[in-house]
Amino acid sequence: MLKALFGDPNTRKIKKLQPIVAEINLLEEDIQHLSDEQLKEKTVEFREMLDKANNDEELEDILEEILPDAFAVVREAAKRVLGMRHFDVQLMGGMVLHQGQIAEMKTGEGKTLVATLPAYLNGLTSRGVHIVTVNDYLARRDAEWMGQVHRFLGLTVGLIQSGMNPEERKKNYACDVTYTTNSELGFDYLRDNMATAMAEVVQRPPNYCIIDEVDSILIDEARTPLIISGQVERPTEKYIKAAEIAKQLEKQESEEDPKDYEVDEKARNVLMTDQGFEKAEQLLGVGDLYDQENPWAHYIFNAIKAKELFTKDVNYIVKNKEVVIVDEFTGRVLAGRRWSDGLHQAIEAKEGVPIQRETQTLATITYQNFFLLYNKLSGMTGTAKTEETELEKVYNLQVTIVPTNRPSQRYDFPDVVYKTEPAKWKAVAAEVEEMHKMGRPILVGTTSVEKSEVISALLQQSNIPHNILNARPENVERESEIVAQAGRKGAVTIATNMAGRGTDIILGGNSDYMARLKIREYLMPQIVMPEDDNLMAGGMGSNNRRPQGFGQDSKKKKWQPSADIFPTDLSPETQNMLKEAVKFAVDQYGQQSLSELEAEEKIAIASENAPTDDPVIEKLREVYKLIRKQYDAFTDKEHDEVVDKGGLHVIATERHESRRIDNQLRGRAGRQGDPGSTKFFLSLEDNLLRIFGGDRVAGLMNAFRVEEDMPIESKMLTRSLEGAQKKVETFYYDTRKQVFEYDEVMNNQRRAIYAERRRVLEGLDLKEQVLQYAEKTMDEIVDAYVNPELPPEEWDVENLVSKVKEFVYLLEDITAKDMEDMTVAEMKIFLHEEVRKAYDIKEDQVDKVRPGLMREAERFFILQQIDTLWREHLQSMDALRESIGLRGYGQKDPLIEYKQEGYEMFLEMMIDIRRNVVYSLFQFQPQGQPQAV
């Protein structure tokens, strides 16, 4: 109705962008005539304009003003360097990103290229732009590939990879544009906020961020907290005692028969009754399970959970006197993984095996809150419209659908549903065989490794050659190799959970990728440094971070792609040229002298058109063009054949919990106006149907006496499936929303404490801050012992004075007599003066040992207290959150209670930090100084 009245809001947004696109297109001709130097000069001009801004608002205005010119410059640079020209729709995508929105662009519409536009524009401010991808490999690929555009135009480009040291990280974060992964960014932020000196801090303040595959990071991983933890000592006897008590407590089966605790299977939680609390307190001989000095509640709750909700040989097994978790989804043993919050220890106590140490959270943040730290946040994805409400409510991000460059020619067949899973797999295999005979490329999507092996076995029986893609990290590079070939005639690819986003399936095969692989095969063994022998022997070591987790002879396997990947053998002339180019590279750089990253970068630059003054790259580029030309002759011909046959056929073997992920799989077919088709094969035994309403459908099938291998296709069924998916999505959304609301409380506290910490790190002279701490502490002591409502003779000045001396031994000479005729305000002023004098004396004593030592001590003690008390506070907040749920029974809103109590706890922590710092500094006795008598 509203759409009919006002038109589609998305269409209106796109309409607004069209005049700017027209302006950029008009500029194109002038900019084409500029020399490379003149084009680079543009960056200097833009920066001079931006330097005139006096505040952030003016800066944004200037960015808006130069946008058409800047985008036109990037388009021209990309044309010269990469041989790629931004389409009009890509310019629109760039504008959407610059506005701090999410651009929904279909697969194959060149999202990676779109990011260069807003990254360049915002990179001009020198405040830093972060481009975030889901894994190290994609970050590296984009930094090498798209980074050339920025480098050509004079911006600096950084790359963060796991395993880099702090110096490298700092250098890369200081660049104008930095490519990285979400986890590296988050952990660097947490580590920066544990640094003890400014020199250790690697990141700059978060400015602008572009997230690739934004839905998977902001939604699928939003609930995942990033945690840095350390080990703590906990009394093991408490776990053992709690396990004994849990054995004596009884489970309540019904309201009529009250017992000690109830079990909520669905929420996997236990609730103790009043009777249970009394019984536990009696057995322990304590007055209150929640006593701050001697808390027992956490241990008892965990012991009951261990008894009721965790079953041996189902949730865990006991092996070599250790409790090992079993993954409920795959049934695999998760060695080395432990349940948190003392639960693992409770299960160890229940099983009577040695109790291992608990870990304590030192710093934590969720992705939701981390990305909200940026001044401007934007993202790209092929599928975000389904999650639009969540993105808008939580992140204040709007979704704009950017039109495709060419209309889609994909056909989606209706779903077919079988009665049993085996019948479904048989039908899938038959469909693959039929399409394979026609010569169409086929992509089969499965939801687990195990299922991909089922279908693989069926295809082997029919002698159909195929490739399997699993989400194992060692397959990442091989994955791109397979995906690059998945569009060849008759190719069959089985992929699990849509692994391998990032490389497009090009019909007829990806000749660019094949040509690069060919060069890699010859160049890498000659030019890359061999790994450390001892690391290679174990097959792991630093090697587990490599894209391929091969063992000892990994290099041979690594640079040698599978033989059938190349469409044709190279002509002898080309082969000789390739060998000569490799020999030239070895002569120039030295035998096995480059790191793998450096060598990859050389190949990446050689396969683009970026200007270069490296003679090796020039030689490699000549060879690349020749190889590519030979391969193109085959892939172009094959492309046309595949298009005639109907393009890529995608077979999905299960509906995913989220419609978005189904759409991603469908989006693999029919990219950039190519033809393609998709079809979902389902069975009543699939998870989604089984959990959400499969019985009804099964009843129907039995009533109609449907044969095992007869599919049913019905609109009603498709609708009920979508309904089930919506239910699941809402369920997960509610969970995320709740996590977010609670975490928001922690987030405000985290911001405050980290801001205070950063002030201390940056402050050169913290003396004034410590003196303020000391004065505040004196005020608090006066307020604690003196009540202005009472007559002065009833004031407890004696104890007040002894308390002051307890904190500051240098005030030994003060007596109650000195203060007896003073008002409260006068007392405070008097103590302020005394404590300042005492501090000067202390400073002289300390600086005698070494000049400037007091300044170092101030910083050290403040940071130490902030870190120690913040760690303890994180635990108290966790405990509060665990127990707060019970408030719901007392007609109170648990969230409001959590906010209030959390705030009070935070204020107490801040007071403790102040007092401890004052006490520690006055007690500080550096070595080499005579002790105070």
From Swiss-Prot:
InterPro entries found in the cross-reference section: Helicase_ATP-bd, P-loop_NTPase, SecA, SecA_CS, SecA_DEAD, SecA_motor_DEAD, SecA_preprotein_X-link_dom, SecA_SF2_C
Top enzyme category: translocase
Subunit structure: Monomer and homodimer. Part of the essential Sec protein translocation apparatus which comprises SecA, SecYEG and auxiliary proteins SecDF. Other proteins may also be involved.
Region (Disordered): 539-570
Main location: membrane
The protein's name in its UniProt record: Protein translocase subunit SecA
Keyword terms, alphabetized: ATP-binding, Cell inner membrane, Cell membrane, Cytoplasm, Membrane, Nucleotide-binding, Protein transport, Thylakoid, Translocase, Translocation, Transport
Encoding gene, per UniProt annotation: secA
Task performed by this protein: Part of the Sec protein translocase complex. Interacts with the SecYEG preprotein conducting channel. Has a central role in coupling the hydrolysis of ATP to the transfer of proteins into and across the cell membrane, serving as an ATP-driven molecular motor driving the stepwise translocation of polypeptide chains across the membrane.
Pfam family, one: P-loop_SecA
